[in-house]
Amino acid sequence: MIEADRIISPNATLQEDSQDRAIRPKRLEDYVGQPQVREQMEIFINAARGRQEALDHTLIFGPPGLGKTTLANIIANEMDVSIKTTSGPVLEKAGDLAALLTNLEPKDVLFIDEIHRLSAAVEEVLYPAMEDYQLDIMIGEGPAARSIKLDLPPFTLVGATTRAGLLTSPLRDRFGIVQRLEFYSVEDLRHIVARSASLLGVSIDDGGAHEIARRSRGTPRIANRLLRRVRDYAEVKADGAITNEVADKALNMLNVDLHGFDHMDRRLLLAVMEKFDGGPVGVESLAAAIGEEKGTIEDVVEPYLIQQGFLMRTPRGRVATQAAYNHFGLTMPE
C-alpha cells in the first residue's frame, strides 16, 4: 500500500489542493490553532507594514498537512501583496529562479514549497537575492563570460519544508523568521471542521465535529478529508446532517478508529504484539510479516504511532507499549 491510498495520509492529492483552496482561511483572524505562531506573525506583519518594508524572509516547517501553504498565502494577504508559488523540485536551473525573482514587485512574497529539495546551483543564486536583493547572472561562456548584478525589489521569501534538518546552514541562517507548526488539539480541529462544514454548506453539530476532529491525527488536511467522506455518508445513509452517531458510523465504515488509526496502523501494532510477543523486532522482519516495504514502515506508518506513544523504536528493534496493548484489549506479556 502506498501513502496516497490511505484516507488518513497527511499529504494532499491534486484534487484536494483545488478543493481546499475554497475553505482555506485568508486572514490571520480566521486562522485557527497555532496561537504562538499567529501572535508572532501578527506582530511581525504589522511592524513591517508600519515601516512600509517587506516582511523578513520566513521559514515555516512541520509535518505535512498542518497549513504551511495556507500560512504563506495569509502572509501575502495581510501584507496586501501578490504571491508567486513554486517548489524546490520545480526549480531545476538557476535560470528558473532568476525568471521568478525578476518578475516580483516590491514587497511581493515568493513561496517555495519543499525548499529542502533545492539544488545547490539554485541555492547559490538565492543567497545574494535574499541577503542583498541582488541577482548575479553570468553572461556568455568560456573566457568571455562575465558576471553582472541585477538589483531586485525588496521581497519576502517564504520557504516551507517538512524536513528542516535537510536545509543547508547558509540557507537556514538567511531566514529572519522561523516558525514551527505543531499538531493541532482536538478542540482546534473541531473549530476547523465546523468552519469548513459551514463553507461547504454541510449541516453538522458539535458532536459530529468533535468525532471527526478526534480521529484526524492532529492534522487539518485529514480533518477536512474525513469531513467530505462523512458528508457523503450522511447524504446517503442519514438526512444529510452530521451528528456524533452519523460521524461515528461513517468513520468506522472507513476503518478509522478512535485514535485515528487505519487498518495499516493496526496491522503493524498487532504484528508486533501477536507475532513477536511485543518486540523488540527488527524492521525487516516486521516488513516481511505484514507484507509492506521497510521504507513504508519507517516513513509512513511508524512516525504517528511513535508520536502517540503506541510504539517505541529501540536499538534492538520496535517494541509495542502498554498503550498499544490497552488499545486492543490485550494483556502485555511479563
From Swiss-Prot:
Catalytically driven reaction(s): ATP + H2O = ADP + phosphate + H(+)
Record SUPFAM superfamilies: P-loop containing nucleoside triphosphate hydrolases, Winged helix' DNA-binding domain
UniProt GO cellular component terms: cytoplasm; Holliday junction resolvase complex
Transmembrane segments: none
Keyword line: ATP-binding, Cytoplasm, DNA damage, DNA recombination, DNA repair, DNA-binding, Hydrolase, Nucleotide-binding
Residue segments, region Large ATPase domain (RuvB-L): 4-184
Entry annotated with the keyword DNA repair: yes
Sites where the protein binds ATP: I23, R24, G65, K68, T69, T70, E131, D132, Y133, R174, Y184, R221
One GO MF term attached to the UniProt entry: four-way junction helicase activity
Binding locations of DNA: R313, R318
Region feature (Small ATPAse domain (RuvB-S)): 185-255
Protein EC: 3.6.4.-
Highest rank taxon of the organism: Bacteria
Biological process per Gene Ontology, one example term: DNA recombination
Function (record text): The RuvA-RuvB-RuvC complex processes Holliday junction (HJ) DNA during genetic recombination and DNA repair, while the RuvA-RuvB complex plays an important role in the rescue of blocked DNA replication forks via replication fork reversal (RFR). RuvA specifically binds to HJ cruciform DNA, conferring on it an open structure. The RuvB hexamer acts as an ATP-dependent pump, pulling dsDNA into and through the RuvAB complex. RuvB forms 2 homohexamers on either side of HJ DNA bound by 1 or 2 RuvA tetramers; 4 subunits per hexamer contact DNA at a time.
Domain notes: Has 3 domains, the large (RuvB-L) and small ATPase (RuvB-S) domains and the C-terminal head (RuvB-H) domain. The head domain binds DNA, while the ATPase domains jointly bind ATP, ADP or are empty depending on the state of the subunit in the translocation cycle. During a single DNA translocation step the structure of each domain remains the same, but their relative positions change.
Family per record: Belongs to the RuvB family.
Full protein name: Holliday junction branch migration complex subunit RuvB
Gene name of the encoded protein: ruvB
